[in-house]
Amino acid sequence: YKGKYMKGWEDVRNARFKKQLELGLFERPDQLTPRNPKVPEWDSLTQEEKERYDMQMAIYAAVIEEVDRSIGRVVEHLKEKGVLDNTLIILLSDNGGNGEPGIEGRFAGKNPGSAGSTVFLGAAWADVANAPFFLYKHHGHEGGCNTPFIVSYPNGIDKSLNGTIQKDNYGHIVDIMPTLVKLTGATYPSSRGGHKVCLLYTSPSPRDGL
């Protein structure tokens, strides 16, 4: 991935949103929020700074690829065991991209990206990771709390919903436990937080608001 991000965070963010529009994740071009004013323009950086930030994002991209590969290994194992269709797999993030501790993020260690090193995206690349939303982790804006919730459950989700994007159903992480209780038929105290996510066992019912 080294060199892929030398075009800068503005161009990468715009390109990602264009792809999101093509995929149907969003419908209107005006849904792309303004760039974080605290983030410097890419062209204002020195060549050394650009190379450093490019490597920072390249390392992050490589980590995401490894996560994807690892999930694939789990899925293949479940297929081999013949239990994939009756297995519920949930993939989500607890918050938006990590803008800590500021624009520069963290890029520590003799060989950033290796074991023992510390690499954080920083606010500039977190702004890209959360496109088209504004801000990132720690903030109440959508960039901090509106994250994907990806579910695979072949025997439990209507096949007509395969590959679809449910944009009108909102949930919270506390909703996962009551959903699992419903699906497994487990017995738990009736007094608990969260609500059952209806998509997993009945017809979707959009919320009026968030």
Region spans (language model):
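Active-site-proximal cap/lid insertion segments
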Residues: Y1-G171, M177, L183-K196
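Single conserved hydrophobic/aromatic residue that forms the stacking wall/gate
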Residues: Y201-L210
